[in-house]
């Protein structure tokens, strides 16, 4: 029986709560309240209502006929998280956590964001539930994603630009944690991925696993059996964990996580924590990180801002360790190829993050052959990446 995290908040050797004493109380309070609400049918009902009526669940599991034909291998299905309100899976988690905030009697939320997607999703849910919202964002990311910064402000959030360190996601998380320590009485920290100290990896996983539960039901309806493989991109890892987790006991289903290979693992310029990192401690958890011998966090690189995190969620670290999932990488070049391929074959423009999964799923489908079934978690749409991709792709015609 797979039963993680344990009562100490560990996923095997990974996870835990490596935080200052001042945050221990907040984490314990959060866990207690969360466990109470998890078994409260009223809370579940409210959550389901907003996911359905506001976010647009369930999302379709779409048979990608043209892509399947092009690849000439297994049948390829797309789990269409890109069709959700705000354009990505992030909203599943922010609606859940903002509801949680209201139930805890808190009036203010803070969040960190890299690509801006989680920031927008948090600002959206905050507007919906009437919460004050502050989003921390690294200066470099804010420049890359100026549109999302404007979106957050439009939704009533205050955007705090972080100018320290590498001015990216890791620094935004550090600032958000500082804010939380100071304002813990009034504020809930909406973490955007399956990372951070316990109970966050568990909470985010639970809110995202609606993806996998729906997928399981839909594929059984369409094919009468489970898929041979599920492919998802992995940064911090919430979209992947969301689709993987409900299949963890189904040993016949291969789970494949695709990390950001950047310019290639051998160059050192990537964001592949499992494939190219080592075990360490950051942001309150023990997991795989990109670090040097002294444990100093290394700069990351990916064409996709949303995969640009120097670590990975502890449950993915466990999945890797117990070989329940296989982790691989796709380079920037390959991601661009996946981006273009899905647009041309299916008329669907994926987020650059999701494009990493698309291109690897093509390989998997070829290996499995005609009798196989592959599901790609299409975690988001590509609108946010247009300006960025225009610099890299020259299109004829």
UniProtKB/Swiss-Prot annotation:
Its cofactor is pyridoxal 5'-phosphate. Pfam families: PALP. The modification N6-(pyridoxal phosphate)lysine is found at residue 90. Its EC number is 4.2.1.20. Gene3D superfamilies: 3.40.50.1100. It catalyses: (1S,2R)-1-C-(indol-3-yl)glycerol 3-phosphate + L-serine = D-glyceraldehyde 3-phosphate + L-tryptophan + H2O. GO terms for cellular component: cytoplasm. This is Tryptophan synthase beta chain 1.
